[in-house]
Amino acid sequence: HAGLPDNGTLLAVAKGVRSQKRGAYLWSPVELSEAHALDAIGPGQHIVFTGTDGLQHSFEYQRHAEHEDGSWTWVGRLPGEPGQETIITFGDRAVFGSIAQGGDAPNLRLTTRDGRPWLVEADAGELATLAKWFTDPEESDARLPLPHAPRGAAGMRAKAGGQILPEAQTSTTIDVLVGFTSGFAQGLGGTSQAQTRINHLIEVGNQAHLNAETGVQLRIVHAMSVNYADATSNNKTLDALTGVDSDRKVYVDPDPAFADLRAARETYKADLVTVLRKFNAPENDSCGVAWLNGGGGTAIIPEDDEFYGYSVVSDGSDVDESDDKTYFCRDEA
């Protein structure tokens, strides 16, 4: 899927496979050169990207990350434009990426579907018509915890003195446990592809922390499958994962479907747990939701707040049957 030699550019449009128009998005089949990315590791190195319009962009190397499953991530930036990053994760069976275009232009996306890589381009004009509350919400995607959380749940164990990443010294490493639904993995083609996708999303998060100079690094300690439906409300799923009934504002037993995941939080000493599932519109109600400890001006009390170290994230695209339009959850959402 990324076996082109280094011919001086990251990708080439694949021959013999037609592009596909899906709503506001054009999917173009491409062939990738992982060799080009490997040759672009190191200060002063660049990845050259040639778009389907023939225009070239050059991205300067910022950092790279190697993952336990053998996948790895390259991060570069348009010269002189902080926040305009290209982030590409190469795995054994999949490649995922986000390619900055500068200014207000929407990022291009690299994704893997049906065993091959695709470049996804958004039509900015059509994209403006796709604003919908679950993918571009006006309300916050953070939830405030109920008061007086039960104690004794797996807790926050933020680490001091984490490893150093380029551009900022990390002072806190947050260990993350990821539970992914079977639908999420099947939609990508399998467990290997799901793991590559998870690694990519974590590195998108890490780059956001670097850009914001928070001194925080996210680290995956384990990823595992969970047997839970995708086409349900993210808010209800967060309640079921946490052990909360938000409608009645009471604590309840967590859904048994998450028993193994919650136990793994203790086993792997995870600070935070997220459930990653395939985006379903409009059933998910959003692209994700999490508890906001300390929200509303309340004090942060680790012994209490550890109970709320959970989040739910939707990933991918789906057609909303109510308007027959295709919606995406952004990598950085």
Where are these regions (language model features)?
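Fold-level signature of zinc-dependent metallopeptidase catalytic domains
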Residues: 3-5, 121-302
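An amphipathic alpha-helix/helix-turn recognition signal
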Residues: 71, 92, 200, 328-329
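Short, hydrophobic/proline-enriched secondary-structure or compact coil segments at domain edges
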Residues: 95-100, 271-278, 308-313
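Short pre-active-site segment immediately N-terminal to the catalytic Zn-binding motif
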Residues: 310-333
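N-terminal prosegments of processed precursors
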Residues: 1-124
